[in-house]
């Protein structure tokens, strides 16, 4: 008779969870940030709000974003005037778009990740799908399983309405699944489309306007598993994870799904709350490793906006190049919510290899990935790079 202990040992992987492939995708419609204020106020019939338009222009100028990608183009918006209004009942129209488009964009990213991984998709044992764009039953996880032709027995996890910290959450969950299920290969997909949050301007809800200046669409996929086979190419090891709610941060970032779509509410002090608490998170993560010089590790941080990055950089005394990959993704794509940190992970490994830096983490061995979002919730993932 086999004991429970023997069964448990046989079920568990030997080594740490490893990111084995990354794929990204965006809608084809690219929006230039410098001309976006004119377009946005025209398409929402708000050109009479001249002072607010000037304010929005300043927001866009300060955003450090050059361009974004959006599923919503002029043609779609003209067909759906309720989406362009500030607070018109429009949830049905928004839902109809995103329940179709979120899985499709996710499929694009997942297909790229599976191609890089190089293994048959029948070897995928688990699927984690994450989106803040639309809710349906069966969910986007089911739709993606069908679109990709995954096995019907794939074990699915659907994460809705997590927001901007969830790029860290999916890695934490994937790590636990990979390490506790020997031979597991976890496909992780984050797919975000701003059709749920797009709306016209108003001078009574400026935090909504901040969202209109920052958010973009994108999907990212990674494949995670422990004990890589010789044919698999590890990129990063997932060594340690944590999630915490910051003290005195209730209401700092809120989102509410209503008849008018998803409304966002931001307190001005979000950058202050994050920068004030970031060192504690780093100490908890890196003290056991004997690391206290935060310029000696590579960094991936959710780029909620330039003020967050600036204040974290100042608080920790970081060299400007530490945030290079993060700032690059913000500049080229905007804030894509949960997908952002996976785009940055992809950018970092590509630039590290291009520049001959020796490891996937800018030539360094250890790194950290941060997700920030509603709560205010912080996700921390300690990464170990791979020699290239």
Curated annotation (Swiss-Prot):
PROSITE patterns (UniProt xref): CHALCONE_SYNTH (PS00441)
A Pfam family that the UniProt record links to this protein: Chal_sti_synt_C
Keyword terms: Acyltransferase, Flavonoid biosynthesis, Transferase
Listed InterPro entries: Chalcone/stilbene_synt_C, Chalcone/stilbene_synt_N, Chalcone/stilbene_synthase_AS, Polyketide_synthase_type-III, Thiolase-like
GO terms of biological process kind: flavonoid biosynthetic process; polyketide biosynthetic process
Role: The primary product of this enzyme is 4,2',4',6'-tetrahydroxychalcone (also termed naringenin-chalcone or chalcone) which can under specific conditions spontaneously isomerize into naringenin.
Protein's name in the database: Chalcone synthase 2
